[in-house]
């Protein structure tokens, strides 16, 4: 039985971590010491330095020649079973989601072995169980955390393809990612360009959107406006590329002469707006003089879009009746992609290639449309990702002369409606991407039914994922800490070589701070959220059930399958019932995949873990 001394040993490992968490919470919530930007910097320090050095410390101290392979096989089989079931659910169920697959895998299979496992199990079953926990940590750092990175990068690539090419993804034969792009996690602004080359197939290039910033600076040097301008579109705001973060709309300098000169044949930028779609009197503010720059011109057949803030829109106009074809031509689809499925309502270049029902034309740099409402953040992040891929519909109060503008997720057969598609711009709850709703004529439809079902060929996606995972791993300190740690342990335990004291103490200083800084980061996250239970009571209860019921149950099945019996079986089950690990929360915060659920699981999991594990210990000892 566990004694009072063993209980005190467990508490000495837990209390200091809670001190760090409460200190961080008070620094933001009560004393206002840290700003959100400073909190982000602390989180980066934890992910890049504290956690990798902590992993190296434990891996290097583990003897790889004395590992209990059967115990490790049971732990690995548990994770494989859970992951397989989640993949089947994601593939076969309408409610399946890759985000939830990653989160549920973390909740049910990645416990807090360092903080609770080692001291608690040493008190229950002796020192050998502590060594088993260290071996679990080794596998977590080398295999399972790397697998999580793979899943996160796959998620980013899948979102990028489905958002940028909802109708033409199946036609893509190659995807090239510039070497300066480290990850597809959505934290850096990207732009994609699709080009039909000599082979007649679609080739995609992904690059940083630095050109947009340079274009802004060049235009500001010419004294052009850099502020949002009010539009006569209800609940919509039109920004030019040089839009600033200032959320206060100011008067537009829209120039009627420039606008109508665009309708002259052979002049101005191409567009598919007909005269019947011109702006007539509306309830919104009237247009004012504009500083619109006419820099249209011929371009190679490309289709461009951006992942965050610049040009990630496709404009589609259904064919109106005849008689609209004598007006100014279609705009460059760097911003708009006119659909040619309608009648002769628009005039376009005859040599522009058509891919997936959309006419591809290039060189769109000038005008970009961002749609927002009062429910969105008051500050418009022009270039930053919105953190979600939510969509909404807005339409003007129309009469026969007004243009109906809709924002929705495109469907392959929706050729009769005019819409603008907005990617990765949050209009609602941004932490559940699988439940984003779009409206069409007042009827709510799930975006899962409107998203493109077709993805690029498996070989194209596999190559893209492997490239991005490799780039992430070679730039991720956790990869090097795990590799160097296992290499050093193989050498040191083979020939009894000790690490030089100068290096060992340097690593020890930062590795000792790893868990404390991870808890400090958790406290910062708590303080920046309005609620301690950030995910809500129902999700918190569900996370606790996954952690303390599902995880141990699957471990029991896996342990029996590999032949674990006796004390080893008890250790395996209690290890699976430990509270949620901190490292998965750090990753979830970095990639913005349900960090509220992971933080709640860590906080309240550590509070209730001790009585739950004691209950398991008593039941297993009967």
Curated annotation (Swiss-Prot):
<feature type="compositionally biased region" description="Low complexity">
    <location>
        <begin position="298"/>
        <end position="311"/>
    </location>
</feature>
<feature type="binding site">
    <location>
        <position position="114"/>
    </location>
    <ligand>
        <name>(indol-3-yl)acetate</name>
    </ligand>
</feature>
<feature type="modified residue" description="Phosphoserine">
    <location>
        <position position="231"/>
    </location>
</feature>
<dbReference type="GO" id="GO:0009926">
    <property type="term" value="P:auxin polar transport"/>
</dbReference>
<feature type="modified residue" description="Phosphoserine">
    <location>
        <position position="320"/>
    </location>
</feature>
<feature type="modified residue" description="Phosphoserine">
    <location>
        <position position="290"/>
    </location>
</feature>
<dbReference type="GO" id="GO:0009506">
    <property type="term" value="C:plasmodesma"/>
</dbReference>
<dbReference type="InterPro" id="IPR004776">
    <property type="entry name" value="Mem_transp_PIN-like"/>
</dbReference>
<feature type="modified residue" description="Phosphothreonine">
    <location>
        <position position="302"/>
    </location>
</feature>
<feature type="modified residue" description="Phosphoserine">
    <location>
        <position position="377"/>
    </location>
</feature>
<feature type="modified residue" description="Phosphothreonine">
    <location>
        <position position="286"/>
    </location>
</feature>
<dbReference type="GO" id="GO:0009505">
    <property type="term" value="C:plant-type cell wall"/>
</dbReference>
<dbReference type="GO" id="GO:0016324">
    <property type="term" value="C:apical plasma membrane"/>
</dbReference>
<feature type="modified residue" description="Phosphoserine">
    <location>
        <position position="221"/>
    </location>
</feature>
<feature type="modified residue" description="Phosphoserine">
    <location>
        <position position="337"/>
    </location>
</feature>
<feature type="transmembrane region" description="Helical; Name=2">
    <location>
        <begin position="45"/>
        <end position="65"/>
    </location>
</feature>
<feature type="transmembrane region" description="Helical; Name=4">
    <location>
        <begin position="101"/>
        <end position="121"/>
    </location>
</feature>
<keyword id="KW-0472">Membrane</keyword>
<feature type="topological domain" description="Extracellular">
    <location>
        <begin position="504"/>
        <end position="506"/>
    </location>
</feature>
<comment type="function">
    <text>Acts as a component of the auxin efflux carrier; this activity is enhanced when activated by D6PK-mediated phosphorylation. Binds auxins including indole-3-acetic acid (IAA), indole-3-butyric acid (IBA), indole-3-propionic acid (IPA) and 4-chloroindole-3-acetic acid (4-Cl-IAA). Seems to be involved in the basipetal auxin transport. Mediates the formation of auxin gradient which is required to ensure correct organogenesis.</text>
</comment>
<feature type="topological domain" description="Extracellular">
    <location>
        <begin position="122"/>
        <end position="131"/>
    </location>
</feature>
<feature type="transmembrane region" description="Helical; Name=9">
    <location>
        <begin position="567"/>
        <end position="587"/>
    </location>
</feature>
<dbReference type="GO" id="GO:0010051">
    <property type="term" value="P:xylem and phloem pattern formation"/>
</dbReference>
<dbReference type="GO" id="GO:0009640">
    <property type="term" value="P:photomorphogenesis"/>
</dbReference>
<dbReference type="GO" id="GO:0010315">
    <property type="term" value="P:auxin export across the plasma membrane"/>
</dbReference>
<feature type="modified residue" description="Phosphoserine">
    <location>
        <position position="252"/>
    </location>
</feature>
<feature type="transmembrane region" description="Helical; Name=6">
    <location>
        <begin position="483"/>
        <end position="503"/>
    </location>
</feature>
<feature type="modified residue" description="Phosphothreonine">
    <location>
        <position position="340"/>
    </location>
</feature>
<feature type="modified residue" description="Phosphoserine">
    <location>
        <position position="271"/>
    </location>
</feature>
<dbReference type="GO" id="GO:0009793">
    <property type="term" value="P:embryo development ending in seed dormancy"/>
</dbReference>
<dbReference type="GO" id="GO:0005737">
    <property type="term" value="C:cytoplasm"/>
</dbReference>
<feature type="modified residue" description="Phosphoserine">
    <location>
        <position position="374"/>
    </location>
</feature>
<feature type="modified residue" description="Phosphoserine">
    <location>
        <position position="317"/>
    </location>
</feature>
<feature type="modified residue" description="Phosphoserine">
    <location>
        <position position="212"/>
    </location>
</feature>
<keyword id="KW-0927">Auxin signaling pathway</keyword>
<feature type="topological domain" description="Cytoplasmic">
    <location>
        <begin position="92"/>
        <end position="100"/>
    </location>
</feature>
<feature type="region of interest" description="Disordered">
    <location>
        <begin position="268"/>
        <end position="362"/>
    </location>
</feature>
<keyword id="KW-0325">Glycoprotein</keyword>
<feature type="transmembrane region" description="Helical; Name=8">
    <location>
        <begin position="542"/>
        <end position="562"/>
    </location>
</feature>
<feature type="transmembrane region" description="Helical; Name=7">
    <location>
        <begin position="507"/>
        <end position="527"/>
    </location>
</feature>
<feature type="modified residue" description="Phosphoserine">
    <location>
        <position position="414"/>
    </location>
</feature>
<feature type="binding site">
    <location>
        <position position="583"/>
    </location>
    <ligand>
        <name>(indol-3-yl)acetate</name>
    </ligand>
</feature>
